[in-house]
Amino acid sequence: GNDMRHTDLSSINLSHAKLIDNDMRWIDMSYADLRYAKLTGNDMTSTDMRYTYTRDTCFEDCIIPMACPSDGAFIGWKKARHCGEAVLVKLLIPEDAKRSSATGRKCRCDKAKVVEILTMKGNIEVEFAVSVYNDSFVYKKGKVVCEPNFCEDRFKECAEGIHFFIDRKEAENYLP
């Protein structure tokens, strides 16, 4: 393989490319097109893949650390709606929850406890919120929410699961 560390590949079209057994640490691949590419056995630790197109990309045997902790309970944040207004939901992802992240910062889990729900303006606490994508998925303070159809494939970023970010600011800035 090749030493590709610190290379700027932002906005590059690598669709259908084959990149095998390379050292791809600290590469900027933001906005790159990797659709249908075969990336096998690459070390992609600390690679910036924000807004990268990865439809049907093969990441077989690649080293891509998850954005969320692989073990233990932790806090996550997501954007939802309360009476038509954007709110932030603070989630406690339990130790036994399934969790994943693809190549970016957005994470998913199969269950979480709703710790608090805050308005975007004024940080006022509210009792419930609904999903931005599914009005029947309701978050209630103090209750556990579950996604029974959680998709185990971590590289399907927008698949079934409770979507969240580790960092509150990322959730605040997220535009669904």
Which sequence ranges carry the predicted segments?
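Tandem repeat scaffolds
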Residues: 1-86, 99
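Intrinsically disordered, low-complexity segments enriched in glycine/proline and serine/threonine
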Residues: 21, 41, 109, 146, ...
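Short linear sequence elements within intrinsically disordered, low-complexity coil regions
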Residues: 36, 64, 142-144, 169-170
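Non-catalytic interaction/regulatory modules that flank or connect domains
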Residues: 70-152, 159
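Extended catalytic/binding region for NAD+/ADP-ribose chemistry, centered on the ART fold
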Residues: 153-175
